[in-house]
Amino acid sequence: MRVGPTGVCNQRGDSALGFNTRICRRDFLNAALLASGNTLLSSLAPSQLLGQQPSWGGYSGVGDYRGANGNTEDVMLGGHAVRDGAFRTRASTAADTGEVYDLVIVGGGISGLAAALFFKDEAKPNQTCLVLENHSIFGGEARRNEFVVDGQRLMAPQGSNWFAIPSSVEQFYERIGVNWREFKYQEWGGPPPAMPLSRSSYHHARQLPSPANFGFYFGANFGRQPGMWLIDPWNHLEHAPLSAQMRSDFARFLTEYNRAPIHKSEAELRRLDSITAEDALIEHCGVSREFIRLFVAPHEAAARGLGPDALSGAWYLRMIGRAGEIERHSFPDGNTGFPRHIVKTLIPEAIAGPHTLEAVCRNRVTFAALDRPENQVRIRLQSTAIGVEHEGEPGKSDFVRVAYTRNGKIYRLRARSVIMAGGGWITKHVVRDLPPTHRDAYDQFHYSAHLVANVALRNWRFLHKLGLSGGRWFEGFGYWTEVRTTATFGSDSKAIGPDSPTVLTLVVPLFYPGLPTAEQGSKGRRELISTSFREYERRIREQMVDMFSSSGFDPRADIAGIILNRWGHAYVNPQPGFMFGKDGKPAPGEVLRKGPFGRIAFAHTDLSGSMGHQMAIQEAQRALTQVLKLLG
């Protein structure tokens, strides 16, 4: 297994926590940087951060996604430089590539790649497309981490995690060669009885009620030292160290959560869009605000960025109570399988081997094949768009100028049309001639930060001994985790048991109930950037020791590696007014969707208020339809 430098153990208990063991680990910010604390973002310009050692991101794994864990240092600094206008006076010095494309797509996540595939399906044979992607590999948040633990290759999602059937985009799955009927999962290989495992990193955590092999952990904040695990909590709430009112709220929420009426009148939706989801939940479920902030807020923040106190009541209630009979699936690496299959469809040579689930998942990317001149669709990695602007008046222009940085140099090219498929937080800084209506719309989009920590384990006997495959907790670091069974086409072993190596994924939303929506996002980003890899590692180890040492967990022996994925703008947070507009203004998403601005269309998934891959694909199809009308 690849090992990085571990630094100096200088706190009491470091040895017991396993800091002096040989695992995958690397600190990312030095002491001088960390001294700036929460003022880091506001007090240091990107140029002051450049060159700081050791690396910002920590250990990043092996394989295609090594060096691409979350928003890396280079990507983060490049984005901040664009935001701060660092390239505005330098664009004139850009080297002209001489290239002219019919379509340039800014952003190589699922939205951008889907738009490229729709283009290839609809365009004339001589029409060309270029995708600019600022990371070292395509996929956006649908990327993976890879470990090798005791000879076994393990994969885990960096962000985007699972998909459901039926789906509004099933035809797209078929187009890219993803047959969900072929998904087979690891069978139980441990002692009887077989323990049911989730197919994703958090399905049991979000399932209401969760299965019997899921638990709640209560620690010092609940008067429990040592803490206690409550197994199968939904059926044993009377044993929870909670007040009678709180236990009643748990039971009431379980009953009412999935009874949210799907069909509401427009008048009722407009009313709900004027209040927070927290107030709407109090109306709908009759639970206390205290209960919502203890249990519902982290439950929802992991899926929607922030808790109900910051979200639109109409948008939120539209998203719950509609699960119905769905079948959940996950690639071994989360939804990383979707961008890999799209790229394999666009450029067959880009991933070695046949177009099968196993080959596309396990074979390496041929990076040299992505940007070949003979490709109708080219993908150019490590290329950050810094300026997109029409040549002349937008309504009369025939071309758009596109400037980007790559390997420290600035380049420019021309396009007959552009689709902005990156996030709205950066799009509003990249499109130079954006009109006031669109800028005002973008100002109504708010985003929150997220941390996804993948912890590779040599075994998970400590969980099985408790009768658990996963659990939730209500204090300390993170909120839940669980063992999952992975699709066999991507795993080295066809069976899983407590002796098997596995990866626990900790989804850690950064939210602060009670603060304004925008302020919560800013505060979360400050925390994400100003906390060192070593400090996050310490919190992970301490949390796991607190919860599992009584059942045999030993961080020195059991943890094989840790990778952090930091996402500064992981989720859009639809605040009250997002669905129908506010103060006489139209809904911000509709302003950007209604048609192209000149020769520029907008396709990022946050326009819908939901960061799911289905919406990414649908937004891409809409935007591509708009630009095809321009191309004729």
Where are the regions a protein language model picked out?
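N-terminal secretory signal peptides
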Residues: 1-27
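N-terminal export leaders
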Residues: 24-41
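Conserved flavin/dinucleotide-binding core of flavoenzymes
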Residues: 52-92, 456, 462-632
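Glycine-rich active-site loop/strand segments that organize a redox cofactor
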Residues: 58-63, 136-168, 187, 264-265, ...
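N-terminal glycine-rich phosphate/pyrophosphate-binding loop and immediately adjacent elements
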Residues: 77, 87-259
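Active-site/ligand-binding neighborhood in enzyme catalytic cores
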Residues: 248-383, 391-397, 583
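Mid-domain catalytic core of redox enzymes
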Residues: 377, 381-505, 509-514
